[in-house]
Structures are given as C-alpha cells and as structure tokens.
Amino acid sequence: MLIESFGIHSTFGIRHLVSLMRILSGIQPSGVLHIGNYFGMMRPAIALQTEGEALYLIADYHALTSVRDPEALRANIRRVALDFLACGLDPERATLFRHSDVPQVTELAWILSTVAPMGLFERAHSYKDKLARGVAATVGLFNYPVLMAADILIYDSDIVPVGKDQKQHIEMTRDLAVKMNETFGQIFKLPEPRIQPATETVPGIDGQKMSKSYGNNIDIFGDEKEARKRVMSIVTDSTPVDAPKDPANSTIFKLYSLVASKNEIAEMRERFLKGGTGYGDFKKQLFEKLWEYFAPMRRRREEILGDKSYIDDVLARGAQRANEIADRVMKRVREAVGLR
C-alpha cells in the first residue's frame, strides 16, 4: 500500500461519490501474485472499495527508483491491474489507474519540493532503510516522500491506508500540506492515515514468511501441477503418522486456516490433535481447498485475458477520473502560488 475501480459511472454515481470520503491506495507494480501478498495486501485493499470513493494508484513512477527493465515494468503494470481486477476490484465502484497517466503529479511534487525542509527528508526512515539494503542513492529515491505527498494531496485524499512502517510518510505529507497552507492560504485538506492492523505473517513452504525472494511462495494463478508440487513440498517435522500433531506450529494448518470455513478448520485441528493422519494427507486436503478457494478468481482472470481491450479500457477510464480530480486541485495550487 501507499502503502496503496472505476469512477466515471452514471451521473447519479458521481453525485453520490461527492459525499463519500476519498480513500487512496498505492499499489507497487511488482511480480507474480502469491498467497502471501494476496492475504497481506491485496484482499484488505480491495475491501476498501465498499467504504468510500476508492482510488487505486499503480505506482509506476515510484517503481522507476528500482526497476531498470522497461519491458518488465510494462508487464508488471498490466499484471497487477489484471490480478486486482480478477480478485474482486470492481471498476464500477472504484478507480484504478497508472501513476504516469496523471503527469500533473510531477508538477505538484516540484512545487512541494520548493517548501520541503531538507532536514525533514534526511530523516526519512524508508530512505535510510533502502540505502542499508544496498539500493543506490539517487535523487529520485531521496525525493520519494515528496512524490508520495503529491500523490496523496493531488486527489484531495481523506484517508490513506498504510502499514506502521509508512506512517511517517503520511506525517511528512501533512507537514508539507500545512507548510503550503500557511504560506499560500488554504489549498490542501490534511489526509488522515489509517494504520492497517498487523496481518498475521503468511508462511511459505519452508515456514518462513512467504516471499518470492525466498523462493518459498505458492502462486495463486500458477499451473495446477506446479501448485500441487509446491504444497506437497511444505516442510514438516518428523512426527509419526499415528502421533498427535501441533496445529499451532504447522504451516499446513496456518495456510488452511486462511481459506477454510470455521467448521473445516475445527475439523482439521481435531484430526491434528488426535493423530492417525499423516502430513501427506493434510497437504492434499490443503491443496484441494486452496485450488477451490481461488477458482473464481482464476476464471475471472481468464475472462479478462480473453478481452484484449478490457484492461486498457479500465485504466483509461480510471485515468480520466483521476485527471478530473487532479485538474481541479492543480488549478487551486497554480493560482495560489502565482503560476496562473
């Protein structure tokens, strides 16, 4: 998230949106979707479309600080749009768009940078953390929080969902908004962070946090044979088949609990504690439940892929709505600072 479908509905829909709070979520255009980032980020983000006017920004400008392969970036942008739409983002209820389809945001970032105190941004946790991980120190990386502030302010965002590690970005955004308001008059509303509740870490097949970089992921839209192979390779202990097993320490049980009903979870827990069932059988049960749970999303994804213009149409409609909002805000900004 900014971590972070489609405005331009009916006339009634647009009037209705005016009275709703605006929620902005930023989405990093990263790689293949797996179970960990679905439950950790995607599902809670999509749920926001029922709470207000939800905007979902695919942060391709931000991605340029780390991605140097243009073909990979283009593919990732389309993939993340496809996956969000397949997993339930509704373009009749929310607005999905590419960052770069609203170029005014870079103009606002420059204007904000002219009042941004150097000391404030030198203390940015994310900048220090990325340098510590070996990311090259570039001006773009240093200015990342200014662009993020522009992302938030240009849409008159009321709420920005973030993890605890990104709360500082919202505080910096508010600081810049206050600075601009004190200098040039009331231009910006002050966005409020919504600190996302800590989601339980989704374990990978080796028991560590599921991550593509660890090679322990189970992909949602992968091949059935490969998905089964991944599930069947989940690391387990050496407890004999007949002996009771501890569900609390089982990757199998933790993953099953994400997709099964309360009754199904209770039944598996009982079988773990009773003994008499081997891990292999539990893995088979887990695979079947995972495959069943994501089946509607796989079908929806195939439908979208069958319509070659659908993603482009959705992103174009989203860009139109996002630009309508951004144009109104930038008109205020330019007049306030003397550019018009």
What are these regions (language model features)?
Residues 168, 174-340:
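Conserved nucleotide- and phosphate/pyrophosphate-binding catalytic cores
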Residues 131-180, 184:
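Internal, conserved structured core segments that host functional sites
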Residues 22-150, 302:
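N-terminal Rossmann-like or analogous alpha/beta NTP/dinucleotide-binding catalytic cores
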